[in-house]
């Protein structure tokens, strides 16, 4: 067998191994990095939480890989904004009624509320500075 074929097979095998390991790592990832400032909303506290001040809510589900990628960013935003805005998560599988009321059809969806009213919405994963600018705009309105 020619040397170049062996090299191609080795490179392909290593690439395949990298992809599989990356997938398995992401699959095991959690959506929550354990921030003490991050709120976990439910049917009983959703409306009360968003009714005063600025609240960023991440609508997510356990099976959503992009949601898992976004999890650490949301936790970081919660820590960085603890003194000026609330940052929260709502599992759409557990609280489907709240998701439906808010028109959530794709996830991850991040919505910023100010005094109970939606002021901005973003669907899909964006960089941290994008979500921070959403919070900052709502605070300055």
Feature-to-residue mapping (PLM):
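N-terminal targeting signals for export/organelle localization
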Residues: 1-35
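Short acidic-hydrophobic, aromatic-tinged amphipathic segments that line or gate anion-handling sites
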Residues: 38-44
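Short active-site neighborhood of thiol/selenol oxidoreductases, capturing the structured segment around
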Residues: 50-62
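Hydrophobic beta-strand anchors of alpha/beta hydrolase catalytic cores
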Residues: 56-57, 87, 110
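The canonical Cys-X-X-Cys-His
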Residues: 64-67, 110
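Typically the conserved alpha-helix immediately C-terminal to a functionally engaged Cys/Sec
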Residues: 66-82
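Structural microenvironment flanking redox-active thiols in thiol-disulfide oxidoreductases
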Residues: 88-100
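Non-catalytic, surface beta->alpha helical segment in thiol-disulfide oxidoreductase systems
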Residues: 106, 111-141
């Amino acid at each position: 067998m020619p040397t170049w074929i062996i090299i191609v097979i080795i490179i392909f095998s290593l690439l395949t191994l990298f992809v599989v390991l990356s997938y398995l790592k992401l699959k095991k990832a959690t959506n929550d990095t354990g921030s003490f400032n991050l709120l976990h909303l439910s049917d009983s506290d959703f409306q009360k939480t968003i009714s005063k001040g600025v609240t960023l809510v991440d609508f997510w589900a356990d099976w959503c890989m992009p949601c898992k990628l976004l999890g650490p960013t949301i936790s970081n935003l919660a820590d960085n904004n603890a003194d000026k805005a609330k940052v929260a998560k709502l599992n759409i599988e557990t609280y489907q009624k709240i998701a439906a009321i808010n028109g959530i059809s794709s996830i991850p969806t991040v919505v910023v509320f100010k005094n109970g009213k939606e002021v901005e919405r973003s669907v899909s994963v964006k960089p941290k500075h994008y979500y921070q600018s959403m919070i900052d705009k709502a605070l300055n309105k």
